């Protein structure tokens, strides 16, 4: 059975690209376009991994992460920030907020599958 990944991203082009890459690698992909819908989808049916933009409408990725980490059914589900926030200290802030990993935009499509696999192996 393929691993299920939830991708929370407000940009439709980014969602399309990520979906294509992940599906080509054999993953089942679910999507959410904002923080609230991502929170709802993840809490109703926890995925194997969450990839999430930080700058989301409604509630940002930091808040989504904090709320998900409080849910018992989300224990062990890696939350990976996929973000263009690349200023000094952004990576540390993201990890301190509870994200389990950090992938910088623009995404390196060739490197992405091995990054995802490494996060899935940690669970």
Where are these regions (language model features)?
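Active-site residues of response regulator receiver
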Residues: 53, 83
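The feature encodes the CheY-like receiver
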Residues: 57, 75, 87, 106
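Two-component/phosphorelay signaling modules centered on CheY-like receiver
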Residues: 12-30
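Acidic, metal-coordinating helix/loop segments flanking the phosphotransfer/catalytic sites
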Residues: 31-49
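C-terminal output helix
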Residues: 16, 107-116
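Conserved acidic carboxylate
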Residues: 9
């Amino acid at each position: 059975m393929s691993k299920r990944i939830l991708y929370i991203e407000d940009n439709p082009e980014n969602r399309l690209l990520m979906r294509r890459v992940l599906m080509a690698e054999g993953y089942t992909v679910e999507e959410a376009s904002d923080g609230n819908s991502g929170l709802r989808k993840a809490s109703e049916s926890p995925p194997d991994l969450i990839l999430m933009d930080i700058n989301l409408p409604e509630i940002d990725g930091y808040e989504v992460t904090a709320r998900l980490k409080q849910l018992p059914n989300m224990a062990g589900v890696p939350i990976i920030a996929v973000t263009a926030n690349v200023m000094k200290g952004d990576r540390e802030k993201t990890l301190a907020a509870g994200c389990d990993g950090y992938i910088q935009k623009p995404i390196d499509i060739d490197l992405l599958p091995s990054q995802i696999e490494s996060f899935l192996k940690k669970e």
